[in-house]
Regions:
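Beta-strand-enriched cores of mature, soluble protein domains
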Residues: 32-181
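Signal peptide processing junction and immediate N-terminal pro/mature segment
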Residues: 22-36
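Sec-dependent N-terminal signal peptides
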Residues: 6-21
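N-terminal secretory signal peptides that target proteins for export/translocation
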Residues: 1-5
Length: 181
C-alpha cells in the first residue's frame, strides 16, 4: 500500500510538473500589449497579456497528500520582450474536487520583465480525463505585489492546461493602473 501511494504521488508529481510547464509554456490572455497601451489606460488595448515560457523544476517535495513544486523559466511577454518566471505550485490530492487521481491546485506566479514584475495567484483543479490530466482554474492579478509598470494593476481570468499535450490557455484581463494614480 505504501509503495502504491508513493508511486501514485510520484506519478502525480510528474503530472503537476507537466502542468506547471504547460501553464507557463504559453501564457495567453484576451485583449493588447499593456506596455504599448500604458498611456491609454482603460482602452481595449490596455487589457491583454500574451507571454510564452519554458519552465523547469528547481525543487519538488511531497507528503501528507501534498505535492509542492518550484518552477523557473525564461520566455517573452508581448510588448515587453524577454521575461523570467518563478512559480510556486501546491497540489492537494486529499482534496480532489473531480474524483480519484485529481487534486486541488494553487500557485503564485512571478513574471519579471524589464520595467516590472507581474504577480498572479491561481486556483484550480487537476482532473484525470480520457485525454489525460487537465488542469483548469482561475487567475487573479495581484496589483499590490506587482511592481514597476504592473504596480496597481488588476485583472482576472481562466486557464486550462493539458498536461498530456503541453497545451494551455489563459484568457482574461490585465488592466494597468493609470500613471500617478
Amino acid at each position: 500500500m505504501k509503495k502504491t501511494i508513493r508511486l501514485s504521488l510520484l506519478a502525480t508529481a510528474v503530472i503537476v510538473l507537466a502542468s506547471g510547464f504547460a501553464l507557463h509554456a504559453s501564457l495567453t490572455a484576451s485583449a493588447a500589449s499593456a506596455h504599448s497601451a500604458r498611456g491609454a489606460a482603460g482602452s481595449p488595448a490596455d487589457s491583454m497579456l500574451h507571454a510564452t515560457f519554458t519552465d523547469s523544476a528547481v525543487k519538488g517535495t511531497h507528503g501528507q497528500g501534498l505535492v509542492e513544486l518550484i518552477l523557473t523559466g525564461t520566455g517573452t511577454v508581448q510588448g515587453f520582450g524577454a521575461a523570467t518566471d518563478v512559480v510556486g505550485v501546491v497540489e492537494d490530492f486529499a482534496a480532489s474536487p473531480c474524483g480519484p487521481g485529481g487534486a486541488s491546485n494553487s500557485s503564485q506566479d512571478r513574471i519579471a520583465v524589464h520595467g516590472g514584475v507581474l504577480e498572479l495567484s491561481t486556483t484550480g483543479m487537476n482532473c484525470v480525463t480520457a485525454s489525460g490530466p487537465q488542469v483548469t482554474g482561475t487567475y487573479r492579478v495581484d496589483g499590490q505585489a506587482s511592481t514597476g509598470i504592473f504596480a496597481g494593476a488588476r485583472g482576472a481570468g481562466h486557464f486550462t492546461v493539458s498536461a498530456a499535450t503541453g497545451q494551455d490557455t489563459l484568457s482574461g484581463t490585465l488592466i494597468l493602473a493609470e500613471p500617478g494614480a
